[in-house]
Amino acid sequence: MSTGTADATDHRISEPPSSIKEFLSYMGPAWVFTASQIGGGEVLSVPLGGAYLGMEGIWLIPLITFTKIFGQYYLVRYGVMTGDTFLDALYEKGWWLKWIFYYVFLGGIIYAIGLSGHLGETAGALNTLVPASTEVWMLLTVLAGLAIVGLRSYGLIEKLATSLLWVFLILIAFVSLQTAGVWAPNLASGLVPSMPGRVDGLGVGGMAFILTMFGWIGAGFGPTVSYVWFAKDKVMGMFEPLDDGVEIDKYDLTDEEIDRLKGWGDIVLWQNLLSSVILAVFSFFMWTAAAATLHVRGIQPSGFTVIPEMAAIFTTQFGQWSAVLFLLTTVAALFSTLIGPLYGMSRLWEDAFALHGLFDNYNITRDTTFRLTILLFSAIPLALNLFIEAPLILFALSGALFAPAIGLMYLSVMYMSFDIDIDSLSPVRKWAVALAVFAGVVMIASGLWEARSSIETIVGLL
């Protein structure tokens, strides 16, 4: 570890993990990201694919999860290599890139609007388990989230999210494998690429369904942005000397420190690859569980009724215990989606305010700003659920306003990654660069399509 001096003979950047045990000790940011993402698009959209299409279209899961992850990899890698988050870097650029800084910053509010759907789903699942009222469960869920995130402890978030991740992975695997006799015979044909049929629960089919799935699963806006701050608070790569209070410049790096940074970049790659495997496995089990319960009975739910419909069938087919396991899985996944991005997006706002001189010019601390931000991001979805009670409209509104953001972030960070003056710190894996650019372009296209369909959904529901 760094000693806090800038002596070039004393390496200020630790060696990257060299054993599996050491690597796993730094997997925390990826665990938190994965837990946060699974409770988003995977819980809400993947079961609809299984319900409407059966095993047809399940080939999309590995395609999407193993493609989108590379754009995210370069978002995190940029910070680990430079000590600046991509948001810091965007702020220093000309307005042709700087506007993305404010787009991402305002995305915190838009993301909070979208969280209203997740909060409503969490409360609904809890109310099915222990009947009280959805309003009571929403209040309790928000209070629990505030109590945890308000401590401003990344270590606590990491431990809790990691525990929730493995709980719902084990539970959904168990639940899905109980129905393997139904879906396994059609698995091979489902893995062969084909044009999917129509999914009325999402209002799309064919290529539109593929674009929608690209937008919803694999790496959502909140978890993706938050991952950068998870890595920062884990103190990886160039974030280490900055955390130690050492003034460091990339031109002052020793050859050994550059080699270590490249090693940290590889660690970020392996983090993302492992995360994509877990996302694919979870999505696979959610899809197959829906195919084996809803599809075989011809039940075609909408986006916000799929979970209770599946729970009811599990009760009928296997008994109440299986429905309880499934609902516990859903609650764990959804709650992890609430706390992870709530922490990460609040850290983003905290750093954004710092760039604008808030803490230098006013008598307010980072801790206070962070806690005020989490209050805002919690109050928005709670108020919208309590007073509007239209989660589908709110979820669609969030998608319409912020759909292309992830693709823009991917492409902008790719440009900035090659703008690093030290060539050895620039990306060298051409195949990974190609996949990241592909993911960025597809995400913009799918985002614009999602915005169009979201607007149509809103108009239809008003």
Where are these regions (language model features)?
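Membrane-interface "cap" regions at the ends of multi-pass membrane proteins
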Residues: 1-42, 236-244, 249-250, 256-269, ...
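Flexible loop linkers connecting adjacent transmembrane helices
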Residues: 5-12, 46-48, 73-96, 124-126, ...
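Transmembrane-helix boundary/entry motifs in multi-pass membrane transporters
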Residues: 17-20, 54, 80-109, 128-134, ...
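Extracellular loop-to-transmembrane helix junctions
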Residues: 21, 48-73, 88-92, 96-100, ...
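Hydrophobic transmembrane alpha-helices that form the core helical bundles
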Residues: 99-130, 334-353, 444
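Loop-to-transmembrane helix boundary motifs in multi-pass membrane proteins
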Residues: 134-140, 321, 353-386, 436
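C-terminal membrane-solvent junction of multi-pass transporters and transport-like membrane proteins
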Residues: 163, 347, 361-372, 396-450
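Hydrophobic alpha-helical segments and their helix-loop junctions in multi-pass secondary transporters
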Residues: 166-202, 210-213, 217-229, 410-422, ...
